């Protein structure tokens, strides 16, 4: 009855029969206990075991009244039960309809969040793939840097084999040192960027996994709620679960439930945007480093070209002077031969003059006269000795000049050999090796 009173929502309908007390009719019955009754003392014991008529009527009326009351109560209870059944049926219908609507709303919310999570998962997956591609570009760029670094170091080592006086710290060496330093700095930068890319990929995968876990939970819940929404009173799978109406202690509230998913999406979106920014930064780094390397490579090539022109010009000048020296050596050798011949030519007249003087010194007595012939012979000998002295001095000077010319020739030939060796190193060794320098696409990691 207590449950029925709780479920009633309006006053009971008016009864078909008004509830009232039965009329109490009094009947006058003659008593057999008077002084002049015909009953004797012999009937005194039988009267005590029988009801009086008044009691009989009272008993009948009591039965009527009880039957009427029970019937009336039964009718009221039947009416109230019918009304209660209708009301509870209506209430159960409305409650079930509202529950189904609420479950449907929950399904819509779940579908919305599930779609957002799916979108974020797809975007994170795409972003991670793009970041992996950027990481691959970084690795390719790092691998490509080994070629220019080996070229630059090989050029420096080859140029160490230049000979004196070409073993100088020229602008080619300065540019090569700049190139090696630039390559080292770029390698360090790309390695640090590679570490950042690897860390970002790991974060992307972690947040993608969080989104996938949340999405998987929501798919499971969506299927559960979808199944629940399809249950009807005619469903055969439903049964009683008395303890299912209790709230779990670990159950979340709608606010915490929504905030949890929103936080997961916000963190994933934040990491995805960070990944996008890092990917753009990597693209700029690879483009700028590739351009810087190619500019430095062009600067080194230009320095090599200018230096080779200088060396070739110096060698041509040395060869020109060598030809002049060789020509002068030939002329000087001819001159020395002429001087020697001139000296030789003076020996015969000197012998003649000295012999004449010697023979005339044997003139006897007064014939040993200092005549003009004697004076002339003496002056002739003196002139011839003076000529021989001058010619011998000139011969010595010519021979010294020839020795100087030979030294210059050897020095020029050595310098020409040094310049030829330097040209061979710079042009054949270094510049030919630099033709293997990677392209901009290779340095940018595209190939």
Curated annotation (Swiss-Prot):
GO terms for cellular component: axonemal A tubule inner sheath; axonemal microtubule; microtubule cytoskeleton; sperm flagellum; sperm midpiece; sperm principal piece. The keyword Ubl conjugation applies. Ubiquitinated, leading to its degradation. Deubiquitinated by USP16, promoting its stability. It comes from Rattus norvegicus. This is Tektin-4. Microtubule inner protein component of sperm flagellar doublet microtubules. GO terms for biological process: cilium assembly; cilium movement involved in cell motility; flagellated sperm motility; regulation of brood size. It is found in: Cytoplasm, Cytoskeleton, Cilium axoneme; Cytoplasm, Cytoskeleton, Flagellum axoneme. Belongs to the tektin family. Its main location: cytoplasm. Microtubule inner protein (MIP) part of the dynein-decorated doublet microtubules (DMTs) in cilia and flagellar axoneme. Forms filamentous polymers in the walls of ciliary and flagellar microtubules. Contributes to normal sperm motility.
